[in-house]
């Protein structure tokens, strides 16, 4: 019995030590060895309770970055504009992963970046590398907060040095935060669009779109499943005042726009799902 107790205690102590070691190594990687050594005492105090930052053997990166930022330990400013490379990795190779990442980058103010490479490796992992020039590193707190809004889970973050960062993200249960949820039998009136309307629906059978007076709407409607795989596309080459269509099975998202130009629906559209 006492031997069993010793084994259990030893296991707990080893796990705690391992968690602390992994956490401290990660903090050192994020802020750099020089700053880590300079602020070692403060870091030891801030991350003393590892259970706040590691749950089920998974580092809670948003909490780690928040703690570093709130205590002045996350230096994002560069001495001059630099080329910055961000590598995103996702085991979900569907278009939804890319869509969410692209939307998030735009949402946090990064509209001028270009793709260095995009590929799927032997393990069917999506790897997307982007480049942009800036005086500040990409703020991980802002990025991770936006990803969380889309129910995307950050698995790993690595500072690779030379202004290169790596983010491994789980999109398995992700949902488009930019899509507007519409309940069955709810009528939603949309104002002048800045981009296509993206809708989120559940178990609806039909979609009705009503155009406003003085619009010249040429319907363009796309139905997607939960992974943003296209299920059906509708394009009409004449003006409609209204349009009703049966929703394909397994539809999760619907894009409603104009076939030619958003100016044709500048007075907005109304949508009803049933």
Language-model features and meaning:
Residues 125-131, 137-155, 164, 204-208, ...:
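Noncatalytic modules at the cell exterior or secretory-pathway interfaces
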Residues 83-108, 209-211, 218-227:
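Extended low-complexity, serine/threonine- and proline-enriched intrinsically disordered segments
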Residues 48-50, 62, 102-105, 128:
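Long, acidic and serine/threonine-rich low-complexity regions
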Residues 24-53, 60, 72-93, 144-182, ...:
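C-terminal edge strands of extracellular/lumenal beta-sandwich accessory domains
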Residues 46-49, 74-84, 118-126, 191, ...:
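Short, ordered beta-strand-loop transition motifs
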Residues 1-23:
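Gram-negative bacterial Sec-dependent N-terminal signal peptides
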Residues 104-125:
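Long, charge-dense tracts
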Residues 178-274:
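C-terminal, beta-strand-rich globular interaction domains
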């Amino acid at each position: 019995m006492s031997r069993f107790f010793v084994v259990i205690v030893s296991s707990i102590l080893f796990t705690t030590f391992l968690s602390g070691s992994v956490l401290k190594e990660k903090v050192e990687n994020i802020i750099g060895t020089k700053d880590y050594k300079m602020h070692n005492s403060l870091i030891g105090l801030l991350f003393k309770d590892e259970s706040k930052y590691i749950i089920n053997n998974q580092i809670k990166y948003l909490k780690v970055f928040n703690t570093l930022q709130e205590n002045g330990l996350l230096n994002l400013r560069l001495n001059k504009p630099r080329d910055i490379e961000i590598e995103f990795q996702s085991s979900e190779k569907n278009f939804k992963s890319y869509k969410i990442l692209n939307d998030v980058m735009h949402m946090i103010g990064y509209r001028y970046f270009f793709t260095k490479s995009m590929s799927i490796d032997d393990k069917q992992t999506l790897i997307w590398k982007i480049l942009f020039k800036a005086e500040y590193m990409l703020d991980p707190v802002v990025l991770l907060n936006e990803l969380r809004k889309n129910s995307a889970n950050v698995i790993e973050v690595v500072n690779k040095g030379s202004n290169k960062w790596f983010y491994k993200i789980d999109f398995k249960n992700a949902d488009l935060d930019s899509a507007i949820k519409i309940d069955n039998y709810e009528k939603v009136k949309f104002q002048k669009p800045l981009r296509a309307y993206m809708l989120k629906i559940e178990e609806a059978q039909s979609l009705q779109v009503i155009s406003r007076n003085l619009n010249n709407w040429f319907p363009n409607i796309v139905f997607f499943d939960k992974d943003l795989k296209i299920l059906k596309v509708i394009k009409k080459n004449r003006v409609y005042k209204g349009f009703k269509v049966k929703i394909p099975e397994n539809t999760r998202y619907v894009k409603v726009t104009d076939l030619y130009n958003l100016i044709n629906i500048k007075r907005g559209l109304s949508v009803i799902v049933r």
